[in-house]
Regions:
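Fe-S-dependent hydro-lyases/dehydratases of central metabolism
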Residues: 1-401
Length: 401
């Protein structure tokens, strides 16, 4: 039971009664099974979850145990350990590969089998090797690395394959950056994305397992000496530029500077991919002291990130205030929100057709963020910020002092 973690994060802050009921069903299941790690939306174990629309969408409506987006919460709560295997009922489970785990998404039937037997039959995937060299230039982010890679191989180019990232460039990336890259392996069809273990990995894992009292022993995995690759490439991080994945799939790559004529209706920053503290800090650096000119929505991935943004100060002003003063609609209700559309009252959802949104999220198939007639363009938090200021796709390098 201590190997099972249940984190409600989709369709939480909505008046949709069936969505609310799902949380109550989870609570009853976790109680019946004696599951220690259920991160409930409310504190009352005998209560019922009901979103109160009269309070609006911006004010916090969750209890002390709520964890937010599962993929971001798992490392924060000390549930990720190098060398282990993680199965999750969401395709972006591969984000945990940043921590030297074999992590992949599975369906509900497989999840039931895992919970009942502790086993699952999977094929060993072939490996695609991405050696990263150099370092990212100002205005270029980890999101640009993975958008570049997917643009090279296509949105099905890694189907049932492992995407392995290593080299000096990978070693130079922060854990947040590695999470962004590993997270989007699935957008190329990847079975998983994985990074090598190093001191950065160990430091975060050790800190978080100690803080949360979770299992702290682990054995990292290393490359086999005779490892072979079905694809082998080197990416010079210093040569990358701000990149956009265009509607209708993550493989439609263009450079931001090539798209500056394209007008936008809204901007969105959030999700497991683009809603981490470092993502919001990068966004705030661009918009600081200025004002966005299109509807811009901000959804931190977890309550911890909400706290970070409200307590981190720049020149005596919280980053949260810097963002709201710039016109960003920030919600304290951390979660998946409009990254995957959701019920019509979901914060940031595109309910009208014909709208174009630039987003720091991870997926842009038709209907992903709401209306099937809307279009989603994926970019880094910095590129989303610059574009929110400009009202059209913009290169963040022009906005950084």
């Amino acid at each position: 039971a201590n190997k099972i973690v249940i984190i409600p994060d989709h369709y939480i802050f909505t008046s949709d009664s069936l969505s609310n009921r799902n949380v109550d069903i989870l609570r009853e299941f976790a109680k019946a099974q004696g599951l220690q790690y259920f991160y409930d939306v409310i504190d009352d174990e005998g209560g019922k979850w009901k979103f109160d629309a009269s309070q609006g969408l911006l004010k916090r409506q969750y209890g002390s145990r709520y964890a937010g987006v599962c993929h971001t919460a798992l490392p924060q709560k000390g549930h990720l350990r190098p060398g282990e295997i993680l199965f999750g009922t969401d395709s972006h489970t591969c984000m945990a590969g940043a921590f030297n785990q074999f992590a992949t998404g599975i369906g509900n039937t497989d999840a039931g089998f895992v919970m009942g037997t502790g086993k699952l039959l999977i094929k060993v995937p072939e490996t695609m090797h991405f050696r990263l060299e150099g370092e990212l230039q100002p205005g270029v982010m980890a999101k640009d690395i993975i958008l570049h890679a997917i643009g090279e191989i296509g949105f099905d180019g890694a189907t049932y394959r492992a995407m392995q990232f290593d080299g000096p460039g990978a070693a130079g990336l922060s854990m947040d950056d590695r999470m962004t890259v590993a997270n989007m392996a699935i957008e190329a069809g990847g079975k998983n994305g994985i990074f090598e273990y190093d001191d950065k990995t160990g430091a975060m894992v050790d800190e978080r397992t100690k803080l949360n009292g979770t299992k702290s022993d682990y054995e990292p995995v290393e490359r086999d000496s005779d490892e072979t690759f079905v694809y082998d490439t080197t990416i010079d991080l210093g040569a990358l530029e701000p990149t956009v994945a265009c509607h209708p799939d993550p493989g439609q790559r263009k450079l931001a500077r090539e798209m500056t004529g394209m007008k936008l209706d809204r901007a969105y920053i959030g999700s497991c991919t683009g809603g981490k503290t470092s993502d919001f800090l990068a966004f705030a650096e661009v918009v600081r002291g200025q004002e966005v000119c299109i509807d811009t929505f901000g959804v931190p991935a977890t309550p911890e990130i909400v706290h970070d943004l409200q307590t981190t100060e720049w020149d005596g002003k919280s980053v949260w205030s810097i963002l709201t003063d710039a016109g960003v609609r920030m919600t304290e209700n951390a979660g998946c929100s409009a990254c995957l559309g959701g019920p019509v009252d979901t914060f940031g959802r595109m309910n009208e057709g014909g709208q174009k949104c630039i987003s720091a999220t991870n997926r842009n198939f038709p209907g992903r963020m709401g209306s099937k007639e809307s279009e989603v363009y994926l970019a880094s938090p910095a590129t989303v910020a610059a574009s929110a200021l400009a009202g059209h796709v913009a290169d963040p390098r022009e906005y950084l002092n």
